[in-house]
Curated annotation (Swiss-Prot):
Present at high level in steroidogenic cells such as syncytiotrophoblasts, sebaceous gland, Leydig cells, and granulosa cells of the dominant follicle and corpus luteum. In lung, it is detected in the ciliated epithelium and in acini of adult trachea, in bronchioles, but not in alveoli. In the eye, it is detected in the nonpigmented epithelium of the ciliary body and, at lower level, in the inner nuclear layer of the retina (at protein level). Widely expressed. Highly expressed in retina, pancreas, kidney, liver, lung, adrenal, small intestine, ovary and heart. It catalyses: 17beta-estradiol + NAD(+) = estrone + NADH + H(+); 17beta-estradiol + NADP(+) = estrone + NADPH + H(+). Its EC number is 1.1.1.62. Can convert androstan-3-alpha,17-beta-diol (3-alpha-diol) to androsterone in vitro, suggesting that it may participate in androgen metabolism during steroidogenesis. May act by metabolizing compounds that stimulate steroid synthesis and/or by generating metabolites that inhibit it. Has no activity toward DHEA (dehydroepiandrosterone), or A-dione (4-androste-3,17-dione), and only a slight activity toward testosterone to A-dione. Tumor-associated antigen in cutaneous T-cell lymphoma. One of its GO terms (molecular function) is steroid dehydrogenase activity. GO terms for cellular component: cytoplasm; cytosol; endoplasmic reticulum; lipid droplet. The gene is HSD17B11. Belongs to the short-chain dehydrogenases/reductases (SDR) family. 17-beta-HSD 3 subfamily. This is Estradiol 17-beta-dehydrogenase 11. It comes from Homo sapiens (Human). It is found in: Endoplasmic reticulum; Lipid droplet.
Length: 300
């Protein structure tokens, strides 16, 4: 009973906050400067990571690029240098905790304190549970979420000491809405979203106001990782569009970025709609892509 009374007493504050949020919709958000910031991007040798590096290079940030693919990493670095940025590259296996920690130690010793961390590296296996091998499940979690713990543990202490920093989690719409035949991937992205939300709350509880957090949750992106994706929610997103939204979110310090915005509405519906209706709605959304179905093979 006391809890309900406390909630009722908060209603005036809810009205004020709602009005404040509505007014802010019509006021352009001020973008912060990232000139001279040391920006570390994992998975920088391809796709979203590469294009994000280009954008930070244009803004005169100092770049630290990590990827397991040396050739892709060098291509990204060359373009960033052509844009006038100072660039440092490290071949890092983000599924290996010790590799992350040793590389982080080199970054701090040779370059300085990372002030913007973009946890972007990711892997995906499109198959049902029967066809997904144990090492694939392990690697999915090691890269898609455990690496976020290790990089954040490595670089957050300096951010908190300086009360200045930004941690970016590249997750997915699949971290909010489940998709069949992406079981390991969805599970890891749900964990990544949970990591972002809990880290955000933990920083607030510790009153570390200068370290910001942002989480990116796009629908299917045309990066080649998932073959022939389609959904009635809209066309497959181009990486350039996603990175433009990501950069705007980082520079205006948005906490959660959904692309398209309808994903946010869908996540709300999932919490309130009857289960039977929700099943019909998911069939209408019609998510499709090429996948290996091990259940059929086992049944033969």
């Amino acid at each position: 009973m006391k809890f309900l009374l406390d909630i009722l007493l908060l209603l005036p504050l809810l009205i004020v906050c709602s009005l404040e949020s509505f007014v802010k919709l019509f006021i352009p958000k001020r973008r912060k400067s990232v000139t001279g910031e040391i920006v570390l991007i994992t998975g920088a040798g391809h796709g979203i990571g590469r294009l994000t590096a280009y954008e930070f290079a244009k803004l005169k940030s100092k770049l630290v690029l990590w990827d397991i693919n040396k050739h892709g990493l060098e291509e990204t670095a060359a373009k960033c240098k052509g844009l006038g940025a100072k660039v440092h590259t490290f071949v890092v296996d983000c599924s290996n905790r010790e590799d992350i920690y040793s590389s982080a130690k080199k970054v701090k010793a040779e370059i300085g304190d990372v002030s913007i961390l973009v946890n972007n590296a990711g892997v995906v296996y499109t198959s049902d549970l029967f066809a997904t091998q144990d090492p694939q499940i392990e690697k999915t979690f090691e890269v898609n979420v455990l690496a976020h713990f290790w990089t954040t543990k490595a670089f957050l202490p300096a951010m908190t000491k300086n009360n200045h920093g930004h941690i970016v989690t590249v997750a997915s719409a699949a971290g909010h809405v489940s998709v069949p035949f992406l079981l390991a991937y969805c599970s890891s992205k749900f964990a990544a979203v949970g990591f972002h939300k809990t880290l955000t709350d933990e920083l607030a509880a510790l009153q570390i106001t200068g370290v910001k957090t942002t989480c990116l949750c796009p629908n299917f992106v045309n990066t080649g990782f998932i073959k022939n994706p389609s959904t009635s929610l809209g066309p497959t997103l181009e990486p350039e569009e996603v990175v433009n939204r990501l950069m705007h979110g980082i520079l205006t310090e948005q906490k959660m970025i959904f692309i398209p915005s309808s994903i946010a509405f869908l996540t709300t519906l999932e919490r309130i709609l009857p289960e039977r209706f929700l099943a019909v709605l998911k069939r209408k959304i019609s998510v499709k892509f090429d996948a290996v179905i091990g259940y059929k093979m086992k049944a033969q």
